[in-house]
């Protein structure tokens, strides 16, 4: 019975796999991961942590969308456990609304791992407040025109 089911399962599974191509002209995975790390850590999180929200918003596509799940379980300052913000100008406004709370908490965002795909990547990061408090989260980012187009963050 298993011998007949397994090939059917494999065929069905393979239908959903994306075609893979390799090219010598493509940058290595390490180069792309480093580029995406810089985009995420330095251009996005460091700008947010430093209060430079306009610089942070410069890495966003005009039609960007953020899906943000509450990372700190005890964080009652975030209005909702889940927030969906669409459009670069609305995201900048949302960041400005969050800035006072983030500054008061002293939180910093630290990217730990970046996994690279084709115009998208996932990451694992930690947000730290003071010496003792931290919360890990994971995220997924899709790029368009080398800018953040889709950004989803959930607790780890």
Question: Language-model segments: what does each one mean?
Answer:
Residues 55-117:
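A solvent-exposed, acidic/Ser-Thr-rich amphipathic alpha-helical stretch
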Residues 36-38, 65, 86-87, 133:
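Intrinsically disordered, low-complexity regions enriched in Ser/Pro/Gly/Gln/His and often acidic
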């Amino acid at each position: 019975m298993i011998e007949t089911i397994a090939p059917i399962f494999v065929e069905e599974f393979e239908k959903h796999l994306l075609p893979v191509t390799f090219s010598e002209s493509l940058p290595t995975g390490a180069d792309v991961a480093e580029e995406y790390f810089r985009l995420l850590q330095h251009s996005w999180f460091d700008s947010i942590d430093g209060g430079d929200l306009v610089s942070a918003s410069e890495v966003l596509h005009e039609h960007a969308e953020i899906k943000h799940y509450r990372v700190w379980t005890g964080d009652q300052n975030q209005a909702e456990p889940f927030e969906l913000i669409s459009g670069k100008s609305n995201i900048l406004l949302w960041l400005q609304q969050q800035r006072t709370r983030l500054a008061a908490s002293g939180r910093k965002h630290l990217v730990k791992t970046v996994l690279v795909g084709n115009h998208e990547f996932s990451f694992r990061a930690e947000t730290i407040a003071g010496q003792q408090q931290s919360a890990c989260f994971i995220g997924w980012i899709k790029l368009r025109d080398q800018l953040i187009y889709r950004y989803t963050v959930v607790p780890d």
